[in-house]
Amino acid sequence: MRFKISALRSSIQIVSFLFLFGWASVAQARQDVVKDQFEVRDGGTLYLDLDYGDVALRTHDENVLLITMQRDVDGVSDGELKDMLSRQDYRFERDGNDVIVEVEFREDATDRAWKRWKRDYDLDLDLEILIPERFNVEFRTGAGNVELAHLIGNVSGRTGAGNLEFDAISGTIDITSGAGNIDNSDTDGDVNVESGAGTVDLEGIRGRIEASTGAGNINASILDQLVGDSSFQTGAGNVVVYIADDVGADVEGRASLGNARSEFDVRTRGKFISKSFSGRINGGGPAITMSSGVGNVSLRRN
């Protein structure tokens, strides 16, 4: 009798293990990887357009552009993954010395299976593109992060919702995020960055700077002499600008509802809840304008 009970317990354990193993094999993450490459020359442009996904742009010293697109879905079978990915169109194409990368889902609001999949499953799309060091980039994403480093070329684009991170760029930058943070450092060229709602961090920019956010803080470190007028503006948040002692500028700061402070010897004014300062620092130079609708404005020594 004791043997029968022990055997029964073992059978239950085996069945339980098989059930759990079978469930895990069905529910495990499914992955699909697509790769392509194109021969290009210096000075071309990457045109990137996708509705969803994170983008990592890397550079190298070869005249080839390499694309790796990885798509992951949790909790689906191979058949379900194949069906869902068949609804996603993508195009990798060379046009002269330029490369076009487009990724887009064909959404059908009347398709019940599509609506269920959108509700129950999470698709992760990661796009990694290796480009020549001397290249230009134009991008548009509906939602997703974009990062790029060590490029000699111009960058422009926007994401509807996502963070933008750019480092060591020799060229102009003109980027926008509808809702996300922007981090830009070590840039030789004019910079225009805008976020609808997010923090903007800038450091080591050697060019004109136009930085704005609808709701968020702006932090900037100016380490080298600017070559043109610059402005930092937030609708709701704090603006903090650090300036090195050998950088000359004509500065003006205004907080409509908040405080305005400067560690440099400038003229300050206060009227009711509005505060401001203005003056010439380190012998003067290009204009630096700082403003906050609701928040504080600070000018500090670096």
Task: Show the residue positions of the predicted features.
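Intrinsically disordered, low-complexity terminal regions
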Residues: 2-302
